[in-house]
Regions:
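HDAC/HDAC-like amidohydrolase catalytic core signature
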Residues: 1-157
Length: 157
């Protein structure tokens, strides 16, 4: 059993609202670089994130909302249509493939849960996760899906 694993995939950086938006996943690469530079992280410690399924995301989010997020990320939703769902706002603007990018962050958290629950690691960190402001049917505070809530429901299952 490993003492700790760090869940990371370069595609996690696709969770990006815009170049000027205050929420930026640069912290992922900066943290990885820092940990590597001080000898606290090796390639063997990195576990790839996986994409959460719609069924897993639906543990904490309405299926209708998941479909709205997919439509928004494929350019099939106007900001006015997305506004009741918290999508297309200043906090949570639409961006290409937003469902896929968000599902990868949720899947990264579930990957961390699996590593600990299956006894593969004592500790696991998905620094791309922790997006806890999302509601069951509404984005909020830069968070499309609430990976923390999904993980809790996932563990309970």
């Amino acid at each position: 059993m490993k003492k700790a694993v760090f869940v990371y995939s370069p595609d996690q950086l696709q969770y990006k609202f815009s170049d000027t938006h205050p929420f930026n996943h640069k912290r992922l690469t900066l943290t990885m670089d820092l940990l590597r530079n001080i000898g606290g992280l090796s390639d063997d410690d990195i576990v790839p994130a996986r994409i959460a399924t719609d069924e897993e995301i639906a543990l904490a989010h309405d299926p209708q909302y998941i479909e709205i997020v997919k439509r928004a990320g494929h350019g099939e939703l106007t900001p006015q249509q997305g506004e009741p769902y918290g999508i297309g706002t200043e906090d949570t603007p639409m961006f290409p493939n937003m469902h896929e990018a968000s599902a990868l962050l949720v899947g990264g958290t579930l990957q961390a849960v699996d590593y600990v629950m299956e006894g593969k690691a004592q500790h696991a960190l998905n620094l791309g996760g922790g997006l806890h402001h999302g509601f069951r049917g509404r984005a909020s505070g830069f968070c499309i899906y609430n990976d923390s809530s999904v993980a809790i429901k996932y563990i309970q299952e």
